[in-house]
């Protein structure tokens, strides 16, 4: 590793979820505070960090492919520092070093804020593995944000659920909620820098506060996601607040009412349902029924009729019959989601479902995924149709990389929208502006339109 006065450049590749993206921003901030600068290309970097995901096997295999390329590079460039962070690192630990001996540092997601300390150990000539359970300290790190308009703020780490297909609890640890004032302080700092939108993040965000002490006079927990939203809503300068990812088991009417009543809360909800069949949900150990999920959606649409809904779903779970799969298709059509992230079941290490003997063959997985993706796209296109001819408030996030004359941004309902950077009065719009856009054209997953004079 290079001496501190000659740190050189770094490159971070992020796989997986929004939590990983937020972790990568923090680690980039640490590296830049140490004197590193971002490289112009991965193969030019003096330090390469892969922040990894193990939710699905294909993401994990992609990491090993990337590592093989960098390991070969390190054999001719011993000054290269090679780091694997995130969930694959946590899952594999020291076995990663045996598989890729060129690695300098293997670190689980709970150790993201310790990157400088761990690299100092690498400086001293050690190969370092940091995967032990660790209490996550407050986010005192100044993150290097990928956007100057929209930011992530972690509010709870880890997950206490035990879904039979999911590896997250074993790699991200138990739930650890941050204190409300610390979260608000971070949001105030971002707003002071000009950020307009914050997404509050948690693997299971509506479980926020379960591990914090305190009971209200009414007998409920003192700290909940609903209370947190009320606490941070008055941050000056912020225009929008979102949160993800929700679990139906903890999604309450009180939370829905807060989203409807607090003006900065966006009318977009990401609530995975995973299956439209109760027996499959029971086998997954999800802890709710299809009927409960429907009640949540009905309540959201009662309070916010135009709210957008997105979800995650798994097809070809072990033992899933054709009839059970058809119930999932029916639920998607019934609810009319704006977007659904789909996946065929992938056995993951250290999960109960991976050991069951009723795994479905690959051809069924491929066919069910193909069919459900076609349905999801059709539903998305139909849902997007309601925007045609409407005027929507769009937060401009930056230039359309495919057309520099356009800006791109999102509606409050999270619809990606493209529009001219120049208004009818020759006004030039820029990132951070809230623009009223007349929607001229709709596609399955995006909108385009014309900015109106404000």
Swiss-Prot record:
Residue ranges of every copy of the MTTase N-terminal domain listed in the record: 8-124
**Cofactors:** [4Fe-4S] cluster
Domain (TRAM) ranges? 385-453
What's noted on cofactor binding? Binds 2 [4Fe-4S] clusters. One cluster is coordinated with 3 cysteines and an exchangeable S-adenosyl-L-methionine.
- Positions that bind [4Fe-4S] cluster 2: 159, 163, 166
Q: EC number(s) in its UniProt entry?
A: 2.8.4.3
Chief location of this protein within or outside the cell: cytoplasm
Detail which positions bind [4Fe-4S] cluster 1. 17, 53, 87
Q: Name one GO molecular function term.
A: 4 iron, 4 sulfur cluster binding
Which family is it part of?
Belongs to the methylthiotransferase family. MiaB subfamily.
What role is this protein assigned? Catalyzes the methylthiolation of N6-(dimethylallyl)adenosine (i(6)A), leading to the formation of 2-methylthio-N6-(dimethylallyl)adenosine (ms(2)i(6)A) at position 37 in tRNAs that read codons beginning with uridine.
Q: Name the chain's protein.
A: tRNA-2-methylthio-N(6)-dimethylallyladenosine synthase
């Amino acid at each position: 590793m290079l001496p501190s006065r000659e740190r050189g450049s770094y490159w971070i590749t992020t796989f997986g979820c929004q939590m990983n993206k937020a972790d990568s921003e923090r680690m980039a901030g640490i590296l830049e505070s140490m004197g590193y600068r971002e490289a112009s290309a991965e193969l030019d970097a003096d330090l390469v960090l892969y922040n990894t995901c193990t939710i699905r096997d294909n993401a994990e295999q992609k990491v090993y492919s990337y590592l093989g390329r960098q390991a070969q590079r390190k054999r001719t460039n011993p000054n290269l520092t090679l780091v694997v962070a995130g969930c694959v690192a946590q899952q594999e630990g020291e076995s990663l070093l045996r598989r890729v001996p060129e690695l300098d540092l293997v670190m689980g997601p709970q150790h993201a804020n310790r990157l400088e300390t761990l690299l100092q150990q690498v400086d001293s000539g050690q190969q370092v593995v940091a995967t032990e359970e660790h209490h996550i300290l407050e986010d005192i790190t100044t993150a290097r944000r990928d956007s100057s308009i929209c930011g992530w703020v972690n509010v709870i780490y880890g997950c206490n659920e035990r879904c039979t297909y999911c590896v997250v609890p074993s790699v991200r640890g138990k739930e650890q909620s941050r204190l409300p004032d610390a979260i608000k302080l971070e949001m105030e700092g971002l707003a002071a820098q000009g950020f307009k939108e914050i997404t509050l993040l948690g693997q299971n965000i509506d479980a926020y506060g379960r591990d914090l002490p305190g009971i209200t006079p009414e007998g409920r927990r003192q700290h909940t996601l609903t209370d947190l939203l009320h606490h941070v809503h008055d941050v000056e300068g912020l225009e929008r607040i979102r949160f993800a990812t929700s679990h139906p088991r903890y999604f309450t009417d009180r939370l829905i009412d807060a989203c409807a009543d607090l003006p900065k809360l966006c009318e977009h909800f990401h609530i995975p349902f995973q299956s439209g069949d109760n027996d499959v949900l029971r086998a997954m150990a999800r802890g709710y029924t299809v009927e409960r999920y429907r009640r949540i959606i009905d309540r959201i649409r009662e309070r916010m009729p135009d709210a957008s809904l997105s979800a995650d779903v798994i097809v070809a779970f072990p033992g899933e019959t054709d009839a059970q799969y058809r119930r999932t298709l029916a639920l998607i059509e019934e609810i009319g989601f704006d977007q659904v992230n789909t996946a065929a079941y992938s056995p993951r290490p250290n999960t109960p479902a991976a050991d069951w003997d009723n795994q479905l063959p690959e051809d069924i997985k491929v066919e069910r995924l193909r069919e459900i993706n076609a349905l999801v796209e059709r539903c998305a296109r139909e849902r997007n149709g309601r925007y045609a001819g409407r005027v929507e408030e769009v937060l401009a996030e930056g230039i359309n990389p495919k057309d520099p004359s356009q800006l791109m941004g999102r509606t409050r309902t999270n619809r990606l929208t493209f529009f001219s950077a120049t208004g009818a009065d020759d006004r030039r719009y820029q990132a951070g502006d809230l623009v009223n856009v007349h929607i001229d054209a709709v596609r399955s997953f995006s909108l385009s339109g014309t900015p109106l004079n404000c």
